[in-house]
């Protein structure tokens, strides 16, 4: 199997983590890549085998208004420093994935600057969508153009143009040759041209064995993007929504239905599972009961898919959009502030334990998913492989819950795999006549190994 089939990702938004200026002043933050390497090493201790870092390349502001695809953002450092960062990750056994922002560019991108200067006679006029010289915009360009999301800061590229396609294909080749990256997260993949993505897959297959393509897709049938001809995976926003709203509404049917639907659509495709990221508010700001962070971490790691952590979420930090700005979701953090977190912070403790278990329990990567019991308040399922099983059990209610279900494999007892975590509570279990009885405290979840 490919490396990404049992990977655990750690997602870093580098401009935020390093405290870079929000508008590109060309001034690097001293020691930015040294800091990023320390966080990648921290991620390795949590069991994260892959680093998704981005946006990374030269831009005017937040990183998604790309100016130069082949120059690391000067606020972070140099190409050579990023090359060394990747090499250090590889030495730890971590893969490195970067953002590929191929749908749009910033206004300072060379081809758009040429369009502004030469207008109707521009060499790169056809690199962009819906250019209209009878229109205008807030920049007073005396022409209008296609954009992403209504923002003229983000100029829409014409992905049907073979020159644009080849420019991006060559960019991928450059990234692999120069930095030795292992894959790309495609920004705004839900609006990328399908034939263009097929071309990206052909290049991915060419540049490096098991080079991984993951797309940012919000809604729809994910198998339209994640399939053998296009992308290996997409962001699982459907599950993300169910994770927090299913707990706020005390409704495990939402999460269970989501998993059934996705398995029916995507079959064996491993979607990219996450609880929060650089675009959505952090769990503590969305959950009505923060005890449910434990439940959601367990779900992300034990349901079918590829688990991930967004930097800082392993400490349970807050993050809420302010006045429409995403910067509060992308804070500058210092590892020194969390030195003893694994020993004192229940959230950190649970993530560290799940990282270890992901490496130790092949059932969590390869095991068949079996739903065992389901109510609005309680949920249990197993991951079964070669006659062995681990069972995840959940209670989202304010009172204890008892559940009973048929054992998925023969067993005479159970082991609580999260019993030693900070904040864990004792549970009551009984194996009898081929069934498992479990009594869980209120608002509690854990992972059991069937033994004997």
Model segments located where?
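Active-site-proximal helices and loops of the catalytic beta/alpha 8
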Residues: 90-92, 113-116, 187-267, 318-353, ...
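Substrate-binding/active-site clefts of carbohydrate-active enzymes
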Residues: 1-9, 13-49, 56-173, 178, ...
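Loop/helix patches that line or flank the sugar-binding groove of alpha-linked glycan CAZymes
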Residues: 2-6, 23-24, 28, 255-412
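Active-site groove signature of glycoside hydrolases
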Residues: 104, 168-194, 273, 277
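C-terminal beta-strand-rich structural cap/linker in extracellular carbohydrate-active enzymes
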Residues: 430-452
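Short, well-ordered coil/turn segments that N-cap beta-strands
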Residues: 47-49, 92-94, 180-182, 208-211, ...
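Solvent-exposed beta-hairpin/edge-strand motifs
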Residues: 408-423
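Hydrophobic faces of well-ordered beta-strands that scaffold small-molecule active sites
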Residues: 8-11, 51-53, 96-98, 184, ...
């Amino acid at each position: 199997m490919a490396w990404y089939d049992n990977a655990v990702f750690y997602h870093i938004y580098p401009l935020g983590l390093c405290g870079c200026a929000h508008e590109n002043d060309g001034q690097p933050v001293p020691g930015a890549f040294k800091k990023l390497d320390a966080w990648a090493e921290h991620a390795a201790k949590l069991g994260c085998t892959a680093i998704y870092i981005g946006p990374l390349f030269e831009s005017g502001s937040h990183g998604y208004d790309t100016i130069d695809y082949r120059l690391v953002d000067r606020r972070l450092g140099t190409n050579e420093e990023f090359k060394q960062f990747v090499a250090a990750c590889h030495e730890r056994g971590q893969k490195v994935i970067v953002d590929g922002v191929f749908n749009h560019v910033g206004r300072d991108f060379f081809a758009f600057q040429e369009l502004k200067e030469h207008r109707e006679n521009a060499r790169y006029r056809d690199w962009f969508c819906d250019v209209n010289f009878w229109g205008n915009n807030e920049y007073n360009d005396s022409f209008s153009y296609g954009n992403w999301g209504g923002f003229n800061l983000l100029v829409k590229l014409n992905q049907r143009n073979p020159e644009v396609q080849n420019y991006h294909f060559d960019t991928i080749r450059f990234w692999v040759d120069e930095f030795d990256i292992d894959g790309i997260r495609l920004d705004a993949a839900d609006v990328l041209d399908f034939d263009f993505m097929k071309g990206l897959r052909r290049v991915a297959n060419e540049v490096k064995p098991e080079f991984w393509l993951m797309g940012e897709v919000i809604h729809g049938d994910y198998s339209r993007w994640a399939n053998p001809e296009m992308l290996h995976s997409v962001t699982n926003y459907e599950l993300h929504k169910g994770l927090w709203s299913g707990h706020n509404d005390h409704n495990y049917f939402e999460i269970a239905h989501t998993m059934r639907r996705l398995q029916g659509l995507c079959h064996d495709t491993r979607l990219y599972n996450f609880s929060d990221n650089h675009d959505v508010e952090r769990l503590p700001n969305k959950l009505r009961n923060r005890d449910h962070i434990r439940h959601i971490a367990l779900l992300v790691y034990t349901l079918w898919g590829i688990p991930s952590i967004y930097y800082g979420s392993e400490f349970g930090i807050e993050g809420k959009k302010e006045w429409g700005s995403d910067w509060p979701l992308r804070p500058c953090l210092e590892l020194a502030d969390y030195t003893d977190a694994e020993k004192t912070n229940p959230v950190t403790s649970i993530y560290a334990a799940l990282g270890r278990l992901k490496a130790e329990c092949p059932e969590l990567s390869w095991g068949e998913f079996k739903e065992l019991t389901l109510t609005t308040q309680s949920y249990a399922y197993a991951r079964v492989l070669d006659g062995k099983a681990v069972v995840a059990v959940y209670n989202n209610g304010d009172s204890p819950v008892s559940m009973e279900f048929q054992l998925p494999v023969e067993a005479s007892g159970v082991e609580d795999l999260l019993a030693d975590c900070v904040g864990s509570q004792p549970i009551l279990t009984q194996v009898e006549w081929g069934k498992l009885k479990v009594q869980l405290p209120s608002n509690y979840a854990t992972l059991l190994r069937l033994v004997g």
